[in-house]
């Protein structure tokens, strides 16, 4: 499964992606937060803008706001959409939208019965367990989901969909983290509501094929958005090879780097952002 980058057919073509680059490049120059250190850079901002614009949902839920750049971006992509922005810490915002509705609660703790979740878009940039988030989306009726943090096996600070498909499990970085308990393992395998476990407690997930099998039963489309550029090395300093880090072909060839300097400089900010459409 290490080579998996897609399942099903994405609702856009590579040609459409390529043709949108120049429009986004002009938009990117107008971003309100020029230095978004710690947040999204051009590879994922382009991906998010393009996918949201193409899906054109009437409601967008974004989990994880940080400085607020993503809120602005979603406004540009879908000017008529209702945007619901949630983050446990709203104090970091530098851009505050007059259109968005803000909540300082977790995605799991909000009543979503007031919106048509089946046509809404859920955008996650909260560095949480993506497999558990997708379970919640299934329970709440969301079908269209974007995960900004989609790290490959052995990398990153959260359990990603890419890792789940690979069967590699997840090993938290740092100290003071907990191994997955027997109850948490059972809840995950039975697809039980992940709010049965603490939301912001990163646990070790042993290598397994259960999660990949459950994803295949419930996912209609899984599509990793291509990077704008692909460098020789990853952000972690090792070789960016297809064997270790399966990646869609980049949108732009390396020979075009002088014409897109910022995109080339920020190429290492790419972490396999993906779109997921759940089966209805």
Regions found by a protein language model. Name each.
Residues 1-122, 128-280:
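A short alpha-helical cap/connector motif
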